[in-house]
């Protein structure tokens, strides 16, 4: 899994891959801002397997912390709804 992550970072550097953050939708063009987030955090029983990983920008990954992907998306959706009202 680590080898695949390094390969993805290399493709970002070369401009051949521009992943989107799963959470905020931001295009990740800087390899230093690219992370693979655990949808179910390791601290909550998640594993480092492809089915439990998703691209995320550094900000979202750090802010998400120990939340699951679904929990963090609920937080983001709540914030968006509060901004509209």
Indicate where each model-derived feature is located.
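Cys/His-enriched microdomains
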Residues: 19, 34, 55
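Histidine-centered catalytic micro-motifs used for acid/base chemistry in nuclease
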Residues: 35-41
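Short, charged surface segments at domain edges that flank catalytic/cofactor-binding sites
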Residues: 1-23
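Flanking scaffold residues of small Cys/His-coordinated metal-binding clusters
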Residues: 15-16, 31, 48-52
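Short beta-strand-alpha-helix junction that forms the catalytic/metal-binding core
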Residues: 44-63
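Short, cysteine/histidine-rich loop/knuckle motifs that typically chelate Zn2+
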Residues: 23-24, 59
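A boundary/linker detector
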Residues: 1-8, 27, 76-85
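Short, non-ligating residues that shape and space the ligands of small metal-coordination modules
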Residues: 30-31, 63-67
